[in-house]
Amino acid sequence: DMKFILNESVLARDNFYIIKPKIDKYLMFALLNNYYTYYQLEKNGKTYGAGLLKLQRYDIENLMFPNLDEFNEEEVEQLILASRNLSKYGDESEIQTISKIISNHSAVEYSSIVESLDRIKELRLKGEK
């Protein structure tokens, strides 16, 4: 499964791209670890044999994130808390929590992004992307 990892003051993809955020590291961690971001990476990454998804630096640089100015203070705090829990405990249900909060600021509903992500991931793993 795709995910970003938090290591002290930097965020790194599991293939070791280092991201130095200009915002709170846990908030950035939340923006990276949600179904909306995963969908973009599935769409833009290159597929290789056995369903391998190769991500390049420009795939990360071209990610579209929601405008954080549209989030209220409570939502930002919830994103940070869920992100901390994901980082500390590895509880992947926190990805759902993060995605649901972000869905409040997206034209794409939560259920639609989950369905679209599942479908594109399934096609990639079958070698049909």
Which residues are covered by each model-predicted region?
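Polybasic, glycine- and aromatic-enriched phosphate-binding surface used to engage nucleic acids
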Residues: 1-81
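Non-catalytic DNA-recognition/assembly elements of restriction-modification systems
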Residues: 67-129
